[in-house]
Amino acid sequence: EEQRKIQSNILTTHGMKANKLINAWVAFVVACVQMLSDNGKIAFVLPAEILQVAYAEDLRLYLSNHLQKITLITFEELVFPNIEQEVVVFIGEKGGEEKGIRIFEMNNLDDFDTLDLSQNGFKKLQHVKEKWTKYFVSAKEMELINTIKTDKRFTRFSDYGLINVGITTGNNNYFSVTDEVCEMYDLEDVTLPLIGRSSHLHGVYFTSQDWDENRKGGKRARLIYFPDTPLEQYSEKHKEYIKLGEDSGEDKGYKCSIRDRWYIVPSVWVPDAFFLRRNNLYPKFVLNRCNAVSTDTTHRIKFYEGVDPELVLISYYNSISFAFTEICGRSYGGGVLEILPGEVGNIMLPKIQDLPPEKKNDIINRIDNIVRNNLDIELALDIGDQTIIDLLGIDSSWCKQCRKIWRKLQHRRLKRS
């Protein structure tokens, strides 16, 4: 506890937020940089989290403000396989004119034999809290990304609706059930259609047919949502299921134990759409067509009044927006792309504001067919790219460059799988 106080003091003294989520290495780096001489250099082996996690955003800003040169050396292979954590070599320099940041990507430690630090130029470092993963793209590509951010033909995903985490049940195994369990305890009238895993989503619509397929396949496709009424009013079968949970200790988990009534799941509402939190090739964005809900494996989206969900859907499946999913998200481990609600909100979408119904349906049906049948997603991106080129006059070279950015960042991430 004393050590935590010292760490907090180091962070707050330098204008940074302190909380229990911040690892000790963050404060250690700040303290060391603060002690550097005017022309000093410093080097660390750090968790690769420094590049992207939210709790290190204050650190990224601090380092960009206090160092003239930052060099990062990353590795495609795990350097310390026993700890299964990605690391980077961080080199910071004070003094002289500001040069910015540069990144060297290496396969493994053997590449140090041929490393030439003079062969990689610095990029201008933006003094913001944004992720440093964006510096894996070239200066020309970064210029395009920044241009898109200020182009009036684009807007942030968050401008279309509220993006929230899925339902935290506290115990998915207990609260998400199969048809068999539902029938056994007569739970039909206290369950909602559920998306419990990424594999439950098939196309860009989640329909009653999709839900039926999941149920008949024996998946936990129902969420138990007991009403906030006195327990005495519950049926005997429902009381029996609650007693079953208590006998097996399901009520003792932290999330359940802090509720007034452990078996009533909070914050249950039906969203307009879903966005996958953790993804392999790309994040699926799916419209809700059967009043389903989701666990926290999937984010929930409630569109603002007047927003056409289908136009937002079309505006997502293109090379530019896909490039932003990789820029805004983070590599979670094993090559998985994790993207949190605030990061989804920062994805740039082209403003498709008007489209004849038959044209809109044709585009969505073609994209849905590609996604639903696990065809190459680039076929869907081709459709989306041509749509925004035709409707908004987007330069085709922008789509080509962003497709290249998406492939590059996706490939880098997947090489860790």
What is the role of each PLM region?
Residues V88-E93, N107-N108, P271, I320-T325, ...:
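A general structural signal for short secondary-structure boundary/capping elements
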Residues L59, H238, V312, I383-G384, ...:
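Generic structural signal for hydrophobic residues
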Residues E1-G170:
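Signature of N6-adenine DNA methyltransferases within the class I
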Residues E141-P357, N361-N365, N369:
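Polybasic, glycine- and aromatic-enriched phosphate-binding surface used to engage nucleic acids
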Residues A24, D186, V190-T191, L379-I383:
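Residue-level detector of well-ordered alpha-helical segments, enriched
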Residues I73-E77, G329-G335, E378-D382:
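A generic structural motif
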Residues Q353-I394, W398, C402-W406:
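Extended amphipathic alpha-helical segments enriched in small hydrophobics
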Residues H411-S417:
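Non-globular, low-complexity intrinsically disordered regions
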